[in-house]
Amino acid sequence: MTKLVLEQAVDAKWVDKVFDDHRQRQYSRELLFSTVVELMSLVSLGLRPSLHAAARKMEGLSVSLAALYDKIKRTEPELLRALISGSAERLIPTVETLGHSSILPGWQLRIVDGNHLPATEKRLGALRNERGAARPGFSVVAYDPDLDLVVDLQPWEDAYASERVSVLPLLARACAGQLWMADRLYCTLPVLQACEDTGASFIVRQPSKHPRLVQESEWQDSGAVDSGTVREQIIEVTSGRRWRRVELSLQTANDSGDVVMWFWSNLPDTISAQQIADLYRRRWSIEGMFQRLESVLESEITSFGSPKAALLGFASAVLAYNVLSVLKRSVEQAHRETQPEGWEASIFHLAVHVRSDYQGLQIALPAENFPLEKTSQGLAERLLALARLIKPKSVAKSPRGAKVAKPKEWLEGKAARAHVSTARVLKAAKADKQA
């Protein structure tokens, strides 16, 4: 299944065409860009422990490891965006054939957030004398929660660049019928106006220092939702644009201690204030996606000190996530009638299956004996047929119970740095229990 979806998402000929269409200074001689993407995808999926190991296992690699690393550290960010957005477009027809639900029928949802890459090892000569952490950059990601796919990505090499500026290229591709949601960092006039100018709608949380308001209407009560009460008003900003502001008064404070939240939106009146307040809660789904990227896939390769190489590693992990997401949907649809309502497959357990079975498949069934599907309909039907062979229990998601809130207290540095022997603590606890 993984091989089928990978070929659909990043067919070698298509990847090389993307390289030719979007490259600026790079060129292909003996090492094709499709080969680089294939190697990085194997590492991101965990099918190879490292790029070095993946390169040594690849038959027919005609360049040295030094040439491979040199190619990777020169990968242009424009190529990464074209790769992610293009591969998502290739997967969307298959996802739609498999079937999916809609959070807000009639609208395409886009959740935007930034992901800063962690500090890398200081292997580069220029970094060795630096005491502080070396940050290789970040990416602003557009995520579709209905499809569970990352549909666009804007990589940025400068870790200190503004996310508010970096999101503008993503908004340039927005269109009517789309609803973009973002946190309070993006509540600025340039961002909101850029979104509205494309015909798209937005829901953005209001920060403490928001754009200046020229006029505010009276508040109108709008009823209640599960988490609290809602009211709204019309606001006008300095550019003369009039938007809706929705206030949500929470029954209990959230994790940040907030009891009141405000949202700005330009959605039409057909979407109620209660819906706007409820829709914003969906924004947290992108946090879950980032968490799965970090825990299931190799999205943070700290040995890649070069910003371009680190961003390629993250983009490869995003690509791998989209592949696993299609596999997850295939398994859920294949077993939907036999499993209880709300049953979900786990991306983590699917990744474990992929890692354990992929190598054996490569040996038992070489590529020349593995026919690939040419249409999304054919691919969806074949994925469902293969998914029915998977035991649902082996890939079922294990939901965790709610965490018990613990009060945060001030702690002395000496106590924070203290340590104990786990074996001795357990032994003492057992003795106390028996006493």
Which residue stretches match the model-derived regions?
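Single, function-defining residue in the core of a domain
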Residues: M1-L47, L51-A54, S62-T75, L83, ...
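Extracellular beta-strand-rich solenoid/capping regions of secreted or surface-exposed proteins
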Residues: N129-E130
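Short, basic-rich loop-to-helix N-cap that marks the start of a DNA-contacting helix
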Residues: L79
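A short, well-structured juxtamembrane/interface segment
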Residues: L91-H100
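Residues within the alpha-helical elements of helix-turn-helix
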Residues: K57
